[in-house]
């Protein structure tokens, strides 16, 4: 349980108040921004691998048409993040929030160096694991540190800056990817530059204090009070200190120890259990609605939609990353105005519609793929696709059939008179690719020419615009404020670990799913999961807008998990506002 100050009506002007308070007290903004670089690291790693993977496939032929190995390179960072998030929960409670961030920075920097120097895919995977460890720790620590070092009335807006820096990191990674497309060592630069923000945060965090609430919980009361006096105004700080003192003393009295966390009691505690249902559920659904298929594989999805070149795929993916960053800015404005719950519901409605569009577009693209021209294919008989030459009925072959050939892998060379006309199915290697390009034709290995490509980009854009302000940022905000102080580190670690496990499942299965059942059916699955997520939010997630953290705990204590579990204002808030 944690103390806080009641601020009636803060939700109506939170965005302006955030600017006003941070302008008057830039120290608060400095705390939020420095810790938020952890979000930048998170976002950069999510985005950079999507572009780097295009060039890793070109450099390592063992990776090029090996779907499992591509998924491994992407998902090993996620596997590392699972362990990192679990370790982060322990490190946050035992060593402190700041120490956990410093550990994350060191691991991320080490991983970036290993990846940049990797001579083979195996060492690249090792580097991805180290980066994942750092990202996992940072993902749950940064919003927690910001939340505990923020005045209650602008807590949502400041924690949203972490979400903005996540999406900003993704946008930056696409810019970096695009900048290094023509530079020797392309993907090595893309992955190695990731160490710079980690080093920057490491330096900045050495100049900042530990979380005041963690310090108070560990008995370092004078240090905590000194920090709170720098964060809160003179008229609010004494009340905040008293509330925090009362909450910590109550916890110690109830639990009998300020150090040892009893996991059985944690699971039995009504407030913790209900908080975990909401917090873990949001983190799981954040991944299962498919966001990181878009962020990890965005250029690949663009190529599946019919855009052939790596550079074009990266350039168009930059648009989705920009929309993602824009959506997080929207979240900062609305999070303390309309609330967490409404933002989630609006977000999921839009996600469902967008996934419906993507399902339809990719279905139409697959069923209208250009046919294979026997004349074009056999023009160079020595490079004709072997599976095509041995097929009983070549009239049934189209571009999609060609790309599924595997003995050996084959590619599609578009018609010289137009990409929608029948083209050639040839063996996929660099010399054949060059031959196709020398005839001013397009070479496809991951998707087919399509007149529906721009509609796919529209669907991706709408998906990002709706996802980012709600499901993109709100789960991290809710998890930073919904747990009692005593269990906040461990519960945050549990929720973040659930997020990364879900992330791993999605990242390791997306390309395999698209190969097995097609891109359209894969997006349909995400759409169905999004409907389930919407129902979950409506029933299980409380509204915590503008509420001090001790009041959130009391709300969880007295309400049952039913459809009307939340209200605009709790009774305690109304009573305290009336008596103020």
Curated annotation (Swiss-Prot):
Expressed in the tapetum, but not in pollen grains. Detected in leaf vascular tissue and in roots. It is a multi-pass membrane protein. Gene3D superfamilies: MFS general substrate transporter like domains. Optimum pH is 5.5-7.0. PROSITE patterns: MFS, SUGAR_TRANSPORT_1, SUGAR_TRANSPORT_2. The PSI domain (383-450) is not involved in the plasma membrane targeting and is dispensable for the transport function, but is required for the inhibition by nickel. Plasma membrane inositol-proton symporter. Specific for several inositol epimers, such as myoinositol and scylloinositol. D-chiroinositol, mucoinositol, alloinositol and pinitol are also transported with a lower activity. Not active with galactinol and phytate. This is Probable inositol transporter 2.
